[in-house]
From Swiss-Prot:
Family: Belongs to the RxLR effector family.
Main location: secreted
Species of the source: Plasmopara viticola (Downy mildew of grapevine)
Motif range (RxLR-dEER): 49-72
Purpose: Secreted effector that partially suppresses the host cell death induced by cell death-inducing proteins.
Record-linked Pfam families: Ank_2 (PF12796)
Sugar-bearing residue positions: 150, 236
Alphabetical list of PANTHER family matching this protein: ANKYRIN REPEAT-CONTAINING PROTEIN (PTHR46586:SF3)
One GO cellular component term: extracellular region
Protein name as it appears in the record: Secreted RxLR effector protein 124
Signal peptide boundaries: 1-14
Keyword Repressor: no
ANK repeats by residue range: 34-64, 69-97, 98-126, 128-157, 159-183, 184-213, 215-240
Domain notes: The RxLR-dEER motif acts to carry the protein into the host cell cytoplasm through binding to cell surface phosphatidylinositol-3-phosphate.
């Protein structure tokens, strides 16, 4: 291995050290590599030079904890969308074990990485229903469209439920138009909890699932007065004692005032 630049620079300013090349190399090796450094850590730092040095020191065929480290490194690279790392690891270790690389690339919206891994997968990694659900829940429409076109199993109701919870109305609308799985009452309940007024409105007008009493309670607990008022008018629901208690605990006095006005009418 070449001597680290930092060690070489110090050696140049020391006549004694500079004359002892074997000592210089030993210092470089000691500084350069530690068993504390894993491939996954190198990948998380986006440092492919460090990754290569770790592999040289360990040896490509070192099995001491390396299988889990290799798979973890691949997953970290896929989750972060680091195509260079992904390609290097898959080409260096084509016979790796089963990983969640496809799912992590999809859920984080890295379509280029997802497509590459899917094309070069070793048969152990599969594109799961959860990958579709996570991609939808996180608002990655390009990934959702690609998975819709390239896999037959589709998604579950969690796709629309989670998209609604996170306020991704465009995903909810796309799933409604192109998929048959639909959603559950959790879609409106979660959207109300997070204060996504437009999502709640759209779901009530375009879907049949409706909501549960959790919707207005969650909206009230989180101080979303506009939603509380709208749900009361359009869904014929009222706040429970629990919602009042949570609103009071969190200082949402405007919610308590509104509830008081409703109770007086």
């Amino acid at each position: 291995m070449p001597v680290l630049v930092s060690v070489a620079l110090v050696a140049r300013h020391s006549d004694t050290l500079g004359a002892l090349q074997h000592v210089e190399q030993t210092i470089s090796d000691f500084i350069d590599y530690s068993k504390c450094w894993t491939m996954a850590k190198a990948v998380s730092c986006r440092n492919i030079r460090l990754l290569r040095r770790i592999l040289v020191h360990r040896g490509k065929d070192d099995n001491e904890g390396s299988c889990m480290d290799i798979e973890r490194a691949m997953e970290v690279a896929s989750a972060s969308g680091d195509m260079e790392m992904v390609q290097f690891l898959h080409e260096t270790y084509p016979q790796h074990g089963k990983t969640r690389c496809l799912e992590l690339a999809a859920s984080n919206g890295h379509l280029d990485v997802l497509r590459w891994i899917y094309k070069h997968r070793n048969g152990k990694d599969t594109l799961t229903m959860s990958a579709f659900d996570f991609a939808a829940g996180n608002g990655h429409l390009d990934v959702v469209e690609w998975m819709h076109a390239n896999r037959s199993r589709g998604c579950s109701t969690r796709a629309m439920d989670c998209a609604a919870r996170n306020g991704h109305l465009h995903i909810v609308q796309w799933l409604h138009a192109h998929r048959q799985e639909g959603c559950t009452t959790q879609a409106m309940d979660w959207a109300a909890q997070e204060g996504h007024f437009e999502v709640v409105q759209w779901l009530l007008l375009n879907r049949q699932e409706g909501c549960s009493s959790i919707a207005i309670d969650a909206a009230a607990s989180n101080g979303h007065l506009k939603l509380v008022h709208w749900l009361h008018e359009h869904c014929n629901v009222t706040c429970s004692y629990f919602a009042c208690a949570m609103a009071a605990e969190r200082g949402h006095h405007h919610i308590l005032e509104w509830i008081g006005q409703i109770e007086q009418t």
